[in-house]
Regions:
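Metal-associated gating/positioning segment near the N- to mid-region
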Residues: 47-110
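Short, mixed-charge, low-aromatic patches
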Residues: 36-39, 64-71, 128-129
Length: 131
């Protein structure tokens, strides 16, 4: 599927002003004057008065939960893929944080692979720290 987004206020990450984009599958195929294509296979979306930004990168995400500094009651739950997508995040770097007792590298790696399978790009930093 090819999607043509027209009249969007585009940031990439610098402001490009109002412009058009072509998206082929999950990739930006063309931007600006090169984003001119029509036909039966092209879906057009009018983004007038809307902002168009690339997927954001969260470089420190507690994808298997965070917290724990205040004991077991202060732990937080795992990240859901919808939480990332609704925030515009398409790439994550998962970390353990302070809790390497109840959260493990195996869990972190498994969650990163699961998020990859759900459509996000996910990496891991290994190790943790104690407070």
């Amino acid at each position: 599927m090819i999607t043509r987004i027209i009249n969007g206020i585009c940031y990439s990450p610098e402001p490009l002003g109002q412009t058009n984009l072509l998206v082929a599958g999950c990739q930006i195929a063309a931007l600006g004057a090169q984003a001119e294509l029509s036909g039966d296979i092209v879906q057009t979306v009018d983004a007038t008065d809307c902002y168009v930004v690339p997927g954001l990168v969260d470089s420190l995400a507690h994808i298997i939960g965070g917290g724990g500094e205040g004991g077991f009651r202060s732990r937080t739950s795992e990240l859901k893929v919808t939480d990332a997508i609704e925030a515009g995040v398409t790439t994550l770097v998962g970390v353990l944080g302070t809790d390497a007792v109840t959260r493990t590298l195996t869990n972190l790696l498994a969650k990163a692979h699961a998020l990859d399978e759900e459509g996000l790009t996910c990496y891991c930093h290994t190790g943790s720290y104690q407070v």
